[in-house]
């Protein structure tokens, strides 16, 4: 055995030789091993650091320098270590073998590493402690065995590691505390047994760990802690029992006299007993949130003079504020998601150093005066039931920087409530019931949130908030004062892109000191927002205001262009005048009964007139607010005028579509019924259907008034809201579009069936060619105009592809109401019924008499191809009697086609020739009386009928008779 002087001489010789080699040529020579080829080496004086990590090595390099002090072999493919592999590395102090595939380490693997202090073996596949290998490491101070598969720690696992200070055994498969193995570590200062499967902590489990300062036991399955479990931990300062299954408060902590930080959150503890922390007067931080706390002893948190952080969240059954008498050093208090209803008046006297008060998600209805809490910097009171803010509630809080009062029921704020808050930089009043906001004391605000206060239409100027950087308001019009409209409307993404500054992004973001403990407090205050208050006051060119104005939230004009403005006015004038004229001629033209189709067309004119009136209201608002719409936009959207406009628009458009569907279906069914049963449906069923259509349209228009859909989503007061609208509003708009699309499909199917039932040459089914053709024109025109509405609505609301808001707005303003003026124009210009009805209203001196109009009215009910009509026998008698009496005045100017009358319901059909009825086989009857019950086919020939345009030659009556040239 060498003597100590001999060893010293040997060591000095080695050092001198190494120094000589280091001072000579740095190129490797025959006397000096080179750095292994795949590794990266760095010299530190005479010592060497070798980094061989992440190289895919399967074996340890053999040519390592004996003076290597640091060796990193982590993240490779090592599967085994040969005995004596590191015996020549006598100066090695840190060895990293983490992230390999080691499942077993032989006994002599670390022999010769007498200077090793740090050994990292985490993230391997070890199933046991390599005890024999560790015995060769007398100087080891830090051992990492976490993230392995270790399930058992034998008693002698750490024998000989008398210098070990840090031990990581977390993320393994341990089911119990290795009590006997830990008794051999008297110098241990920090240990983690987290992320295992431990269920119980026995008594005296750590009795020999008198130097232990930090103990982590979180994320286990611990259900019970013995009364003396922590006996012997005289120097323990941090205890982490979070995320376990504790059922009762661990009274064993009373033996921890030096404990400063305690974590019990996310357990099943239901009660905190009286004097729970009596034995730990040095406690500074307690995290106790997310436990089903039902009881808190009145003295539980009293006289903890060092306590500065208390987090007690999720205790839903706690209704009283805890008594914090003697806890005068408390700086951060978090009591969220509890049932607290009232704050004691003397809370600030007990907590004079309080800086952060977080009481969100409680049931607080009234706030006391907090003027004695002079050091308060943040107050969180969101999701409570506060209704009013008094003058002295926050008075004299000169250090207050952030105040969160969102999601309450605040209706009134005293004008002087914020007047003394000179340091306030963030104020959140989202989703309250404010009508006005007092501005006194808010000049230093940099972030103001007012969203959700729908009754707050107050305009804010730049002078009110000279330092403001972020503003969130209920209406986009309130952003117009901050120059948002300077370069027309922009989307939110564009504004965010313009407000982005690379230098600000690259700047280091350090949390404020007052927020240092918030990661565990669940107090979700935005660090970036509060950082604005401490940054140097450099000028900022613009304010980031939301929601951003756009085509649906204009700043100056409701209608952006004169083209749209003139088009809307034209639609208004044409729809009101033309539909009024149609209504007048249809319903006031005389006592003659209306045909079913004509009744439906008249009802459609009334619906279209409502659409025109709604467009007129929008045009009037545009004219009255010309150039300054932002001042009135919020009040218009939330007012009764917008509701009435939207109601009329939806009622008119939906009634028009439904009535058009009814007209098409009625035409198709009538043809089928005439062919099958010889008669058309009764007019009463058509009237009932029309009333049903109007009732359904009224119901659809009333749904947004009951919060199903939304009229005030935009100043257009239409349910077709922009994509950023509420889901309920978008769903209602999609439902309307789908219903209308279904109606047009039904209409198309009905008319296809009608034409399929009328093959060429079959002329006995259609009784009113003009009205049937008019309905066909309505189907074509309205369907064609509705296609872009449906297409853009689906594309915009469902985000199928980008659609500019300007295009959507133009379609809603011009294309959507266009049928309201086009439908009556088609009737006025192309339907012969209008000219006849107009003559009845204003007869001219040369116009035919009423009898001639009656006959003409019957004759006009003819088909476009054969001009046949169904006429009752009583009507034919009137015509025949008139022919015998003489010609009415002016009748010579009115042309009638020649006709043949054929019985529809007699077995042997007859026809009229001269003054006799002749059977179909040619037999004549003298002065016969036609049957009173039944109908005749009136066949017109030799004339061009209004509305049909077809002519057939050959008159059958003598020309000398009164109607010989006409009937």
Swiss-Prot record:
InterPro entries reported for this sequence: GPCR_Rhodpsn (IPR000276), Gphrmn_rcpt_fam (IPR002131), Leu-rich_rpt (IPR001611), Leu-rich_rpt_typical-subtyp (IPR003591), LRR_dom_sf (IPR032675), LRRNT (IPR000372)
Compartment(s) where it occurs, according to its Swiss-Prot or TrEMBL record: Cell membrane
Record has Protein biosynthesis as a keyword: no
Disulphide bridges: 642-717
Cytoplasmic face residues: 589-598, 666-687, 749-774, 831-967
UniProt keyword terms in alphabetical order: Cell membrane, Disulfide bond, G-protein coupled receptor, Glycoprotein, Leucine-rich repeat, Membrane, Receptor, Repeat, Signal, Transducer, Transmembrane, Transmembrane helix, Wnt signaling pathway
LRRNT domain sequence ranges: 26-66
Membrane topology of the entry: Multi-pass membrane protein
Gene disruption: observed consequences: Simultaneous knockdown of LGR4, LGR5 and LGR6 results in developmental phenotypes, such as cleft palate and ankyloglossia, but not in tetra-amelia with lung agenesis.
GO molecular function, one term: G protein-coupled receptor activity
Gene3D superfamilies xref list: Rhodopsin 7-helix transmembrane proteins (1.20.1070.10), Ribonuclease Inhibitor (3.80.10.10)
Residue stretches spanning the membrane: 568-588, 599-619, 645-665, 688-708, 728-748, 775-795, 810-830
Domain of life per record: Eukaryota
Tissue: Specifically expressed in multipotent stem cells in the epidermis.
Record carries keyword NAD: no
Segments on the Extracellular face: 25-567, 620-644, 709-727, 796-809
Matching PROSITE patterns: LRR
Annotated glycosylation sites: 77, 208
Signal peptide: 1-22
Example of a GO cellular component annotation carried by this entry: vesicle
Gene Ontology terms describing biological process: bone regeneration; cell population proliferation; positive regulation of cell migration; positive regulation of Wnt signaling pathway; tissue regeneration; Wnt signaling pathway
Role played: Receptor for R-spondins that potentiates the canonical Wnt signaling pathway and acts as a marker of multipotent stem cells in the epidermis. Upon binding to R-spondins (RSPO1, RSPO2, RSPO3 or RSPO4), associates with phosphorylated LRP6 and frizzled receptors that are activated by extracellular Wnt receptors, triggering the canonical Wnt signaling pathway to increase expression of target genes. In contrast to classical G-protein coupled receptors, does not activate heterotrimeric G-proteins to transduce the signal.
Family (UniProt): Belongs to the G-protein coupled receptor 1 family.
Stated name of the protein: Leucine-rich repeat-containing G-protein coupled receptor 6
